[in-house]
Amino acid sequence: GTASFVDANTMKVVKNDGEIMNVTGTSILLTIGTRPYRPPHIPFDGEAVLDSDEILEIKELPRSMIVVGAGVIGIEYATIFSALDTQVTVVEPRETMLEFIDKEIVEDFAYQLRDRNMKLIFGQKAEKVERDESGKCLVSLGNGRVLKAETVLFAAGRVGATDTLNLSACGLEADSRGRLKVDPETFQTSVPNIYAAGDIIGFPSLASTSMEQGLSLIHI
C-alpha cells in the first residue's frame, strides 16, 4: 500500500485492496528511497530513451548506447552493456566520474574502460535528446557535437520519493530533489520525532551505507 502524513504522529495507509487505516506512533522512520530523475526536456519513451528503471525492461540488446551521467548507476550500466558488446558512450558535464572515489583509482578505472573501447566524454552537457526519422537517438552536446546511438540511458541523478507523503501535514519540507535534511549523528529531521535514512537523505546514496544507517537507528 501507500502511506502519507496526517500529522507528525499519524500516517494514513491505503492498502492495495482499498482499505484505509490510520497508524499512530511516537516515532516515525522514513526510508522511502528514491526514483530516477526525469527532467521534462528529456523525451523518455520507454523504448529507446530510458531511465535506470526502464533499462531493466528492454527486450533486445542494443548495438550502441549513450549513457548520460557518470555517477554510480550510470557507470554500472555502462560497464554491464559494454561487457555485452554494446558500443557505449558516457557523457558527463563534470570533468571526471565518481567524484567521491580516490582520484588515482578513478583515473585507472577510466583508462581500463577506454581500453575496452568505451568512449568517455567529460566536461560536456547533454543539451538535447531526440530521435531521428530512422528511430536512432541523437544527443546534442554543449560544444555542438551530436552523438548517435540506438539507445539513450539517462542516469543523471535520482530524486527522493517524498512527493506522495504529504510532508506539509507533519511540518517537513523536502529540497528541490525531494530529499530530507537530517542530523548526521542521529538522522533526526527538523521534526523531533521523525527520522530519515537511506537514499532519501542524499549522499552517498549507497545500499551499504543505507543499511548501516538503518541499523544504527534501531539502537538509538
Task: Put a short name on every predicted segment.
Residues S4, T34-R35, G157-G160:
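Short glycine-rich anion-binding loops that position phosphate/pyrophosphate groups of nucleotides
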Residues L30-T31, V67, F154-A155:
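Redox-cofactor binding/interface segments in oxidoreductases and associated redox assembly factors
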